[in-house]
């Protein structure tokens, strides 16, 4: 099917319409509004063990779930409640000190209107996001932020586009205010995202990734040939020279191997003659991965050999492991 219109022109118009709505919404925060009162309300709720319950139906339900996810990721207790399910038992999830945010662009959603009276009966404070303070829903609520827009960005001015973008943005406004009020830090964020890059930088330690088995350990008297076999089998690009007490003596790196081959060293030669003796080693297993990476890059080595206070080999960590995690010094 041929496309008989300019996709780029539509893309430009959609983004301009949505950007304009966001900029116009700034105006509501340049005159008296409920934002500060809402932030204080949520903070007081949290102090008393409560949470922010966010309600929406249709597209607003999906936006509500995203706002819940953002709140949780920044240390703010939150939960999504579907209004229909609430009327059939899920209302029990709304606890004594909870605050409720109800999202409805038009503010006339019957599902939400039916739920409001039950929430008010239980003495819950209601925040509303709608297009007008005169909507039925906002009249029943206690606090209000505006979703007013000039038009939806879709070609027929009907599908939720600009309105859902603005709703997401207002959710971000609440989240940002709560973060600032609680002095939420990068360390706090990382604690809620241990699997993310920041979490790895701030929380994962050397001992958490240390390889302690199947190590390429060889004696200083090992032949060049046998050392190459050991390096090939263990796939770390190096071999570790240890004495009978398992104390670190040296490291045979791939660079040592290349230099030996260029010099024509016999495969029968003992590796102690051309390996790196008294290599750099690492003792602090409680160090963060970023510190380990900085150590490797500072000394221009690829294998972090970890030893105890008696210089006995405990395990290794390879530079590639850290780089694969996305770490950068």
From Swiss-Prot:
Keyword Iron-sulfur included in the entry's annotation: no
Gene Ontology BP, a term: carbohydrate metabolic process
PROSITE patterns (alphabetical): CBS, SIS
Cross-referenced InterPro entries: CBS_dom, CBS_dom_sf, GutQ/KpsF_isomerases, KdsD/KpsF-type, SIS_dom, SIS_dom_sf, SIS_Kpsf
Pfam families the UniProt entry points to: CBS, SIS
SIS domain ranges (all copies): 38-184
UniProt keywords, alphabetically: ATP-binding, CBS domain, Nucleotide-binding, Repeat
Chain ranges of the CBS domain: 211-267, 270-329
Record-level Gene Ontology MF annotations: ATP binding; isomerase activity
Cysteine disulfide partners in this protein: none
Domain of life: Bacteria
Key word Nucleotide-binding present: yes
Positions with a binding annotation for ATP: 56-61
Membership in a protein family: Belongs to the SIS family. GutQ/KpsF subfamily.
PANTHER family: ARABINOSE 5-PHOSPHATE ISOMERASE KDSD, PTHR42745
Annotated NCBIfam families: kpsF
Name the record gives this protein: Uncharacterized protein HP_1429
